[in-house]
A protein has these predicted regions:
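Patatin-like phospholipase
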Residues: 1-201
Length: 201
């Protein structure tokens, strides 16, 4: 988390040049919580507090966890903003049989911001990848959570349709495969280009 703090710096959401909302979930009430002011790092930390991976975050009188538990594709927070285009990213797209091809590290070597992101991802990578049974407890838990989030995402998107939808295949990587960051960044670029091409056609 120290690397993440270094990426976002020490600033408040109100100081950002564009509007920002981090979405979290109130663990006790199950309510969706929009974090639109206060410390940026604290808001992001609460919004990524994935159950069984990161500890919940105490925010005022609430205990917050990952917002994806109740809203995997949060479009509603943007409805009040003055925007020309609404772009959504859904990581629960249709599964694909072939993984994305690996890319060269040179593609990100010349960009300091991407280097900082890669440093954060590499810091989270375990020294040794533990051998986990193909359908072990964690695998079943995360797959079940993903299935629930897929259903919630479809319901949310039926109510709020974005102008551009960028979809990533749900089986693009495992939950802890942080070391595949370069490959997945390139996959994201490819899917973004495809989504905008469809939107223009």
């Amino acid at each position: 988390m120290g690397v993440l703090r270094g990426l976002v710096g020490d600033c408040d959401i109100e100081e950002l040049p564009i509007s920002f909302t981090a979405v979290a979930t109130d663990l006790d009430s199950g309510q969706e919580v929009w974090l639109r002011n206060g410390n940026l790092f604290d808001a992001i930390r609460a919004s990524i507090a994935t159950p069984m991976v990161f500890t919940p975050v105490r925010h005022g009188d609430r205990t917050l966890i990952d917002g994806a538990v109740v809203n995997p594709v949060p479009i509603a927070p943007t409805l009040g903003d003055a925007t020309d285009l609404t772009i959504a990213v859904d990581l629960s797209g249709p599964a694909e049989s072939r993984p994305a091809p690996p890319i060269s590290a040179s593609l990100i070597a010349d960009n300091s911001y991407r280097r900082r992101i890669l440093k954060f991802v590499q810091a989270a990578r375990p020294a040794r990848v533990p051998k986990v049974p193909s359908r072990g407890l964690l695998d079943v838990a995360f797959t079940s959570m993903q299935t629930m989030q897929d259903t919630i995402a479809r319901l949310r998107l039926s109510a709020y349709s974005p102008d551009v939808m960028i979809e990533g295949p749900r089986n693009a990587c495992g939950f802890f495969e942080f070391w595949r960051a370069e490959e997945l960044i390139e996959l994201g670029r490819d899917r973004t280009a495809q989504a905008f091409a469809r939107a223009r056609s």
